[in-house]
Amino acid sequence: MRHGVDPQARYGYLPWIVGFSRLPPCSPSDRIHDMAGHILIVDDDVIFRTLAAELLASMDFDVLDEAADGQQALVLVAGRCPDAILLDISLPGSDGFTLAPLLAAACPGAKIVLISAGIDYVPAEVLQTCAADAFLPKQELAVADLSALLTA
């Protein structure tokens, strides 16, 4: 069965902001480099995570892991750092703007791409402030140049 991303679909919601404790950064030996393009997908919608993982796999990326919320993402990166992180802005108990700097501190050098179904644009100043490298509306995931976003 073939899957795709419905450009009309809307995922997620806008939650309140909460903080997380800081995690120690991954050491270079913790980063996985046996294949190019190890990705962590952080999104509360299991259907979106599944579709995104299939799309990334079809583009020869290796989906290292998936997280349904910020706390789970922080636990996952404590053990091993991905090369890139697709991070939903709207998550239960937190948001991508708050979580991005914590993930960037835990995994220096990992590309962080914020994604959202409810927001179409994030100014560059906001991306820089929250330590994200790029923003991509979820509706554009299937047509975006993910190789450039995730490995540039």
Where are these regions (language model features)?
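The feature encodes the CheY-like receiver
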Residues: 92
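Alpha4 helix (beta4-alpha4-beta5 surface) of REC/receiver domains from two-component response regulators
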Residues: 98, 119-136, 140-148
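Two-component/phosphorelay signaling modules centered on CheY-like receiver
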Residues: 46-65
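Short amphipathic alpha-helix used as the core "switch/output" element in two-component signaling
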Residues: 97-109
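Hydrophobic/aromatic residues positioned on beta-strands within the core alpha/beta folds
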Residues: 115-116
